[in-house]
Amino acid sequence: MRRDTLAWLGARALTRRLGLPRAKSFRVQRSIPVPMRDGAVLLADHYAPRTRKPAGTLLMRGPYGRDGLPNRVYVGLYAGQGFHVVLQSTRGTFGSEGAFEPGRHEVDDGADTVKWLHEQPWYTGEFATVGASYLGFTQLALLVDQPADLTTSVITMAPHDFGHSVWSTGSFALGDFLGWSYQVAWQHRGGWIRQILRGMATPRTLKPVLQTLPLDPAAAELLGGRTPWFNRWLEQPDPSSPYWAETGVAAALDNLRGPVLLITGWQDAFMDQTLEQYRRLRARGVEVALTVGPWTHGSGGTEAVKESVLWLDGSRRAAAPVRICVVGGDWLDMQEWPPPAQEQVWHLHPGAALAETSPDSGAPSTFVYDPADPTPSVGGRLLVSGKSGYIDDTELAERSDVLTFTTPVLPADVDVIGTPYVELDHRTDNPHADLFVRISDVAPDGHSTNVTD
């Protein structure tokens, strides 16, 4: 095993920034072979704390690499808190054998990795899991049949149902999953610095492809034949089909024993699935906590890490089970989600008005959609877009293919907490049409900022 000086220095600096206990030193053994039941060998790195009394063992499994400095600092932070940490590359990624197929193999591969973990002389007898996005999905895969020695999990911004993520609106989430597939397809080329730069440039890279008709040849050239799942996803528009059932891990929500901390952001692409995870686990009586910040899928990482460490050391478990950030306000501690709230009903009126009274009959509001000038995606719960999250959407609201309905100036501040519902009577000339509804906050100067979609 060798010391990773850069990872340790980065972990120490991040530890200090987050106000966590002083980081211990650690050593790293890289590219350890881990056998799977079908003969494939997956590679893992082991971060070993230099202490006689380790805090425990953590397992992380994901497709995004092990060698990049951000990954090493992230894992090193936990090792610096005294944990043995195993970071494994899922099959077909970064030296692990087999083919990467999102959602497939993770249940069996996770179980086989735990079997290997039990055989290691340094294993502490119990382990926990942590990780975000796909590293949260692999945790849920392991929780389909929770190992007896898995004591707790911290699942951050993770789906349990890929079909729902890709097709839940009735149309394919093209920008999100073409972008994600592109990043996965080429992430291994050029080292970790180029990987970061490629990720930052993804929205710009995607733009000409998304504007090309027909899309198929342009998308195929972008992906370079490296993502066979992408075309299969396009061919499976029913999220409840057997295909998607085989890639999902919703069974974990019926089986896991907990305890679990779920972390998401109001503008995270998988926020709705995290809230569903919380509701289903709470309904079963599982010990589950929830943290919701003002984050997108790509932000809030350091705060989520701090929440994870506090959960693992027991202090977060002793606090209120639900912590949410009211955007523009304070963090609130709650006993449950959603909290008791007063329902408000607003009605669309002719003349672009939004009022609490029902409208009299009137002419319908209409707009014309031009496929040559599609309505852009601006802000919101996007996965890889550079324009995700809270954003000034004033120009979007002023487009001729967008209808707006606005309240009078509100006499007092209103906290919007809960799930909004929209009942809309509509018809279109073209049966192949999608409608998108957004709630935005209009400032006194007329500028509009999205709240939720």
Regions found by a protein language model. Name each.
Residues 272-287:
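Active-site-adjacent alpha-helix of alpha/beta-hydrolase-fold enzymes
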